[in-house]
């Protein structure tokens, strides 16, 4: 009987541990409505340090039975506001996330290549892409995550990841329910 209880306890602990480390809930913090302050380089991969600052909103909802989510983004950029959509999906086999971006200003263009990665101390995601006809590496980092705030950074690397230029920084503040 003691052996049976020990085995059942071990199975329960193993199942709980597997659920806790799976990663499927890593983006749950993002579900809801956010005010976002953005700081983006005016010119990317050109040695520029001049940033454009603007505000926006993001509304995120779960999808794929909780193994994904969709974010509707609004950017109040000087020169004309626009929208974009982020789609995130979790792969249970690799325990990693894929993130796709669709810009509303160019909605008929193909989706950007998915960024892939996972959360450890922060969420870090990479993709190979092109910028102005040149191959680049893209990196996104989610950090400083609390129930009411989060920090996001995008960086490009023109040299395969040896050096990085952080070109977009966003600070998220959860909107109060109305």
Identify the residue ranges that each predicted region occupies.
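Hydrophobic small-molecule pocket/channel-lining residues, especially in calycin-type beta-barrels
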Residues: 17-178
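Bacterial N-terminal signal peptides
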Residues: 5-13
């Amino acid at each position: 009987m003691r052996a049976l209880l020990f085995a059942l306890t071990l199975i329960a602990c193993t199942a709980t541990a597997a659920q806790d480390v799976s990663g499927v809930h890593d983006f749950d913090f993002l579900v809801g409505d956010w005010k976002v302050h953005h700081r983006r380089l005016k010119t990317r991969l050109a040695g520029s340090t001049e940033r454009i600052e603007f505000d926006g909103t993001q509304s995120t909802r779960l999808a794929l039975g909780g193994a994904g989510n969709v974010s509707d983004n609004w950017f109040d950029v000087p020169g004309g506001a626009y929208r974009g959509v982020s789609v995130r999906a979790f792969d249970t086999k690799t325990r990693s996330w894929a993130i796709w971006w669709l810009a509303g200003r160019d909605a008929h263009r193909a989706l950007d290549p998915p960024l892939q990665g996972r959360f450890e101390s922060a969420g870090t995601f990479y993709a190979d892409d092109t910028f102005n006809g040149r191959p680049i590496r893209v990196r996104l980092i989610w950090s400083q995550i609390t129930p009411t705030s989060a920090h996001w950074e995008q960086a490009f690397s023109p040299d395969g990841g040896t050096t990085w230029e952080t070109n977009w920084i966003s600070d998220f503040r959860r909107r109060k329910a109305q």
